[in-house]
Amino acid sequence: MSRKPCCVGEGLKKGAWTAEEDKKLISYIHEHGEGGWRDIPQKAGLKRCGKSCRLRWANYLKPDIKRGEFSYEEEQIIIMLHASRGNKWSVIARHLPKRTDNEIKNYWNTHLKKLLIDKGIDPVTHKPLAYDSNPDEQSQSGSISPKSLPPSSSKNVPEITSSDETPKYDASLSSKKRCFKRSSSTSKLLNKVAARASSMGTILGASIEGTLISSTPLSSCLNDDFSETSQFQMEEFDPFYQSSEHIIDHMKEDISINNSEYDFSQFLEQFSNNEGEEADNTGGGYNQDLLMSDVSSTSVDEDEMMQNITGWSNYLLDHSDFNYDTSQDYDDKNFI
């Protein structure tokens, strides 16, 4: 069921109230009191709607209404309540005694809204205008890609930093420096090993030519260029450095140029005797009257002797003393 309208629209006056209409309404309410707004227009002799009479009395003609300018405290209360409640003027009017909701609404629209805009505050959200008015600009500025930056600025842009505000690429640079140092020290070590190999080649060549002095030990040649730095590098990069050093010590003790057992001339004589025996079995091919003792060490062809160095190395590897030393070092290594 719909509510019955308070009055019929025919013949009703609209618009501003006159002073005569205000006197009739005030005199009737003083005699009969408030209430019954539907019947008041007929009883008071007014051609107005009952709602219009009620609002005129509540907002203007009521004697306890406070009129005049709003104080600074009242303005602050209205602003704070509007930020939390919005446009609920009747609720705001309850916190301002003797102020009507209609008067508060009119004062907000005519004064307070303009005051907030002048201070740079949005009257709807009560936040700074710069915070809400430029969200698109902030999103565009925050979404600038690194490709749009100039090359000079992109070089100066630091990478992602860690929790202690230090760039992460510092750790990668330090690791690269360590790897470069290790590789450089490794190359130095390999160069020294190559130098040792060349010195061993010169020693064997000198033994073939017979120019090697018998008083020069092999251990002195091995220890000439090994400094403390090379030993430290060997310990750092070779996990079996101690075992290899043990093998070298045994080689120093067991292998000597002065030892007649490892004399290269005897090896050549034995090699020639073996070839002579093979020639006897096969029916010749070599001159049996030729003896190695008749050939001096200085008359031996150097090119042919260098080809037989492989045989000399095989002789060392097949020798019983050398095999015993290497096997003992292998057992010591496994024991460790």
UniProtKB/Swiss-Prot annotation:
Q: Per the database record, which ranges form the HTH myb-type domain?
A: 9-65, 66-116
* Compositional bias ranges of the Low complexity kind: 141-154
Q: Where is the composition biased (Polar residues)?
A: 155-164
List keywords of the entry alphabetically.
DNA-binding, Nucleus, Repeat, Transcription, Transcription regulation
| InterPro entries noted in UniProt | Homeodomain-like_sf, Myb_dom, Myb_TF_plants, SANT/Myb
Question: What is the annotated tissue distribution of the protein whose record heads this document?
Answer: Expressed in both vegetative and generative organs. Mostly present in seedlings, inflorescences, roots and stems, and, to a lower extent, in leaves (in midvein and trichomes) and siliques.
One GO cellular component term noted in the UniProt record for this chain: nucleus
Q: What does this protein do?
A: Plays a minor rheostat role in aliphatic glucosinolates (GLSs) biosynthesis, mostly short chained. Together with MYB28/HAG1 and MYB76/HAG2, promotes aliphatic glucosinolate biosynthesis but represses indolic glucosinolate biosynthesis. Prevents insect performance (e.g. lepidopteran insect Mamestra brassicae) by promoting glucosinolates.
Name by which UniProt lists this protein: Transcription factor MYB29
